[in-house]
């Protein structure tokens, strides 16, 4: 049996070229002012939809989604603070982080002491602009560098936020790639942050390129890519797609996977789901500095997929963990913070995880009484791989453990050998009549 698709190998080739393309796509998306609703997320989905087939869904304001309701739609055109000289001291056109995301419209004049309660800064990083939101409480405000605050004169200011908060809809995008099985692999990433590169243009770009990589291939599983607003988007999708959710067999939430930090994988609520084991195995061999974290109900949209009513096998793949790096939710999470090499490596890791899941099967040894004589079949020598001894060991491990009950991932975990070399061994032994696949039919 030939490997279905060498995704990991494909992503590894021309890593520099692939990384440059990923970074360029992030650069194109970076200027857009996104939020959990509105034209910013629509524009973002439109750009993703030029690269992969994307179905757009609009869910009206007020729609009940479990214990929540779809919020009003927010759009912004301009915002500024200017002094009596009509010069803007804070300008939304220079950074869309300057406005408290979801601010209600305001246009008034006020003295500095009245304005200050509406200003947000990071004193410990005085040149950085914070990212703040007020999704579910109507308010307005500006986020500015602390040095900007210190430079404000005690005078009257004109304050303008040219925005709308009114009935509309919540927007999300889906890319569905059918496989032989109706069982699904889910890839989810939040698309609601404005000009923040690692969180989460990294996830959006890698997911888009991953869908391109999978598109047109002969797939075992069907794949569903979700580009959604954080929290409320996942809740909305789950409330509208309970039957679809029941078909999810593996899943990854992708976030903050473009910085230079080590990989972190947060396990699903199930703790030992196949995707948890697959991610841990790939990271062990591809990124030895990676850490596997236990499940926690704090984080990204894995919180919703892993809620007890669904309890889906969905983990979260990151590099630096949210909230642990100073650039998190600040203007320092910019395109310079995003590494082209890291993006390419993240794409390769994701592809390798899915390659493992696609090829993880159980086999039956057709010559189970003592070892079959490999030499007379030409199987007791290397086929030209980088580790001849490992190739022989892989064949012996696969033969010994192929009792119809152990999968290749089981064998990989027990032997310490990379999954890929065991999969190659299983294919070779199958071609020589020594193994038979025993997996039940899919879908």
Describe the predicted segments one by one:
Residues 1-443:
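N-terminal hydrophobic/helix-forming segments and targeting peptides
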